[in-house]
């Protein structure tokens, strides 16, 4: 089974600086084709995350001006994190229990990546395919 570290090796990590406008952040999400971005301060410390869901629930539904509103004012600050050595199943359980689609991955107190529920489900599908192949070969081996 693939590990969290292996999944992250194939992914880029993008961040946005604190103080950015919602408009700039949304443009960045669209440009990078991502659904969530960590918001960092000048030292690289993660202050929160901004997601498509934050845009809908905290900006659009409240008729806030995306050109004037700072992402810091509407980002999610209560973060659910995973450590790099956690199993994919542990990450999936955290995501399910907290009803989130992305989880930040930390190694030695440093942000090293983001895992999405899609990443974990694709991993589960691959594992199931491998199990089916092994069982098929066992059952139909000559």
Each model region followed by its residue ranges:
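The conserved cystathionine-beta-synthase
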Residues: 16-33, 40, 81-99, 106
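Short acidic/glycine-rich loop or secondary-structure boundary segments that cap or lie
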Residues: 24, 46, 58
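Glycine-/small-residue-rich active-site loops that bind phosphorylated ligands and cofactors
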Residues: 14, 80, 112
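A glycine-centered beta-loop-beta connector
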Residues: 29-32, 37-54, 95, 103-118
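Tandem CBS (Bateman) regulatory domains
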Residues: 1-11, 51-81, 85-96, 117-142
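Compositionally biased, intrinsically disordered low-complexity regions enriched in proline and serine
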Residues: 15, 103, 139-141
